[in-house]
């Protein structure tokens, strides 16, 4: 049974991913508060130590990251930097720390979002972070070809977050729990790398 670490396991997205993997994989649930591993995705040395405590594993799934939804006029550069760090740099930090511990042809799955491809008002920070992740994965896939696989799942607003975001994603078809589960399972099992699995488009 493959050993998969899911970071962000206690969040809205992470809980659905964990539920979809637990039957067929040994899932280790990680977040700032656990339950299996406590992890600070911004601290490379800390992340490396946590992964070392697990030993070799077969896959990393990152379900972390958020950005501020403000108009460009409202965004400070500090807001922008924080959003990029939280959504993009934290996930790349996890990926970099995981590589020495991954089994041969192991998988890394990061999470971006539809705003990397399709605009919404007040979404400039999300667009920058998601777009950067999407482009970075193709480069990393080339660098690590034959050694490991790295992909991204890019959902729309997920069904269990529609009420939270309200009209911000008006007209976008929510991504279902089933679609989320299939996508993350595919990145773990299928012989693909450098792919952005875009789950839905705006209506």
Segments and roles (model prediction):
Residues 6-20:
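N-terminal Rossmann NAD(P)H-binding glycine-rich loop of SDR-like oxidoreductase domains
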Residues 30-45:
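Rossmann-fold cofactor-recognition segment
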Residues 36, 83-84:
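A hydrophobic alpha-helix adjacent to the NAD(P)-binding/active-site core of NAD(P)-dependent oxidoreductases
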Residues 61-70:
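Conserved NAD(P)H cofactor-binding loop of Rossmann-fold oxidoreductase domains
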Residues 71-72, 79-81:
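Substrate-binding pocket helix/loop in short-chain dehydrogenase/reductase
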Residues 83, 93, 107-145, 154-157:
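Catalytic loop of short-chain dehydrogenase/reductase
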Residues 152-154, 159-160, 167-203:
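C-terminal helical subdomain
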